[in-house]
Amino acid sequence: MAGSADISKGCSGQLFAELHSLSHYSFLRSAASPEELVRRADDLGYAAIAITDECSVAGIVKAYQESKARDIKLVVGSEFRVPEVGTLVVLAPTREAYAELCKKITLFRSRSEKGHYQANIDDFFDGFSQCLLLWQPDFSQAQLLAIGEKLKSVWQQRFWLLYERHYQADDERAFQAMVELQQAVKVKVTCAGGVCMATIEQQPLYDILNAIQHGGSLAHQPGLASNNAEHHLRSLSELQQCYPQKWLAETLVIAQQCQFCLSELRYEYPAELVPEGMSASGYLKQLTEQGARWRYPQGVPESIKALYLKELSLIKEQSYEPFFLTIHDLVRFAREQGILFQGRGSAANSVVCYCLGITAVNPAQIQVLFERFISKERNEPPDIDVDFEHERREEVIQYIYRKYGRQRAALAATVITYRFKSAFRDVGKALGFSEQQLQYFRRNLDRRDKEQSWQQQLVQQHPEVTNSVRGQHLLQFTEQLMGTPRHLSQHVGGFVIAADDLSRLVPVENASMTDRTVIQWDKTDLESLGLLKVDVLALGMLTALRKMLALINLRYDQQLTMATIPQEDSRVYQQLQTADSMGIFQIESRAQMNMLPRLKPKTFYDLVIQIAIVRPGPIQGDMVHPFLRRRAGLEEVDYPSDEVKSVLERTLGVPIFQEQVIKLAMVAAGFSGGEADQLRRAMASWGQNGHLTRFEDKLINGMLERGYKQEFAERLFRQICGFGQYGFPESHSASFANLAYVSSWFKTYHPAAFYVGLLNSLPMGFYSASQLVQDAQRHGVAFLAADINASDWNYCWLPKEDTNSDETVRMGLRQIQGLSESRIKHTLMQRPEDGFTSMHELRKSGLRDSDINALARADALKSIAGHRHQAHWQSLSMSDQQMPLFENVKDRPARQLPAPDEPDNIKADYESTGLTLGRHPLALLRNNPELKNCVLASDLMTCRSGQVLTLAGLVTCRQRPGTRSGVTFLTLEDESGNSNVVVWANTARQFRQCFLTSNLLWVKGIVEIHDGVVHVIAGRLKDLSGLLSFTRLESRRFH
């Protein structure tokens, strides 16, 4: 065990334990990861290493995992920099000491905003009865003797002075001061490296990080660069030259006392949900049986009963009942509050979850693999993801805090790491480049180019920069910085709930959002230690669906729910087969739209396959085309055995889901459940470490031993490799398919309600409000402009008697940019029945100038002041009437201004609302010579395959799948609809600038028609964005 490794382990007779080292979880203060520090310490022959990040234990779990692999002792601690005192390093020798440390870190963090802490010397005179303290004094300060004596009186034998030597100019003075302080206080001295680097080679990156931290540049502030690299882990011989032997030996004494290991942590889940007099297992069984009767009102099938009894037995054996009861309590609360939710992921493999109402997919609809959810051999906590409406998830989060208290519940952390854009920017600034220069360099870089790295592109485009030393450093350090932690953020919804004070287990700190707290460990850390978390996630489509249901139920006096929407409706599938899926959850991407006419879903299970098959795994594993050929009857389905047939029959002999791969390994190659799960994990990390190769022999030999042919065994392994980290679980796909079907049903039968629900739930999903409104118009939905006297805050589905149409929608004021929601809603509450009649009356409602100006620019004051120019003029002329003296002054006589023309109106529409209800901008440009002979999107179906043509449109979507090297799918929008353009790597590279940045793109290419799907293969590209000078349109870069 790493926590109790043999302390006598040494190298060349010299023994040393590093007691003060920072990892890159002391954000921007270290160039080394925890793993690198542990590995290097072991290589150097250290007896132990302490990871002592600043007011944090964020790196210790990763260090612990590495220390177990290396069999080097890990000491847990933390560093605190205290003004006018120096640096205090606190070490945890025992489990109780570790709890003390975590509680103190929590206290210090609670005093400050996210990312900071406050600690003073008085904090170290109380509350530490078990920890060890190393004090590195700031010898520039006074009163050190008094502080030292007070620390000794409190900490007694648990207190040392800490000396670190880094070959600075004042080393001798500091050494003498340390000796004098030791003699005065009569306390022992130990030594450490103050480590911020694993190796000397990390010094240049360390200097870059230091410049970033201080917001300066090494070019203009040379003092930000370190004098040497002595903050790295030094060899034992180097350390022997630095420090007295007695001080070195003291490091071992201290390390010997530190016997705490993270394996000692025990996590207890809340148990208060169990009624008095009942056991957790008995109560969970009771709830499951009640739920089974609710799910199966005609009688619970024996097969279902057998499954849930088997699951309950394993849940009891693993003591997971409180976890399931907690999830059940959360969804019960959501259901009582009318909040839509749905469990997904591996939990959909569980019949218990289905009976408890956590998941919505009937296990009879999919092939259940409970081992994918809970496995005795895996001995890891289950993962239950529950999506809630994104607008109301906060209600669930605050319910958790109310029920368990902030001492017992907090969100898991997410480590925000440097990605290319942020690394390029911060490194560039640290090297002295200006923001304008960096934007210029980065402008035409295509990070998705699989044949040319971004470095090669930069060298090619800006040789004058990259030939310089500074330019070379920009290339080098940007690459090194990518992946380095930048700060902690909150997980999207992973809650850790404890039976007792959570801060005894892990420190808790403030999140950037009010009323949120976050622990210092991320999801991976929790999994490594076997700690349970509850995933309370947000999903915009659930918000939209709840609003659609409310609209239908109110309009038609129904009690429709997601569960009572008619199933297997042929009209729904007919619409999907035509790729009419804009706005439909999970099947609205261009790739999904291209697949729909080919796969032609006719049943719910077809939809499950549809969602899973358009993924990198099936595509890379060459599973898509065989499946489509077999589905179309063009290829014979052949199974090498009945066992394989039982696994693959529903997908025509092609493994599409992750569960199928696991089952195949078990039935065809003889894998145990635990071995099959190890295979799944290797698949998940294939792109990172290639661990799949170690299963190749076992998988292939296992199949050969069972009589399968070599060709089948090798093909299956290739397919597994193709899945890589992108294999999609059937349970996950089934949960998503349920939402996809429901949203498709609304689009088919109630398009106005469908689009109103979506528009009132933005921002979410794949498409902008402009694209959704245009799609709605193509489906017969009419839109009326926003008006202060007719609109509400949200889009409204208007009564048929008001419009003589059942599909008319009034734009909501929410669509107008720059409005205050609270002030507008206050004004709407005061709106007279007949509406406002003057600008003066409107102002008295409490709106500010900015609100009235925004309404005027959006042409939403037409009923009061006329066209937008007139209304805007009146709003400006009223600015001198805000003083009390002018409170009762009537509106001035309005100067009559000319009405805007059509281009002006379109431009103002886009600037104020992001969309127009007038003609499409391309309709106004259609007679421009640049667009001469361009084919309309609606006419592409009449073209023949192989025809050369030109087309033009607004770039609304750029997609580059991670599977098909070098290909990008563009969506171009004109006044008639959308067209699909395929741009291969060579074409993208040849026309890189317009390909990456164009808003209005002209394309010359060749038509390709396959299975009713039309593409244009681009040969030439031209940027026509200049023609859009009358609008403020922006293209969408990449999804």
Swiss-Prot record:
Signal peptide: none annotated. Keywords: Cytoplasm, DNA damage, DNA repair, DNA replication, DNA-directed DNA polymerase, Nucleotidyltransferase, Transferase. It catalyses: DNA(n) + a 2'-deoxyribonucleoside 5'-triphosphate = DNA(n+1) + diphosphate. InterPro entries: DNA_pol3_alpha_NTPase_dom (IPR011708), DNA_pol3_finger (IPR040982), DnaE2 (IPR023073), DnaE2/DnaE/PolC (IPR004805), DNAPol_HHH (IPR029460), NA-bd_OB_tRNA (IPR004365), PHP_dom (IPR004013), Pol/His_phosphatase_N (IPR003141). The keyword DNA repair applies. It is found in: Cytoplasm. NCBIfam families: polc, PRK05672.1. This is Error-prone DNA polymerase. It comes from Idiomarina loihiensis (strain ATCC BAA-735 / DSM 15497 / L2-TR). The lineage of its organism: Bacteria, Pseudomonadati, Pseudomonadota, Gammaproteobacteria, Alteromonadales. The gene is dnaE2.
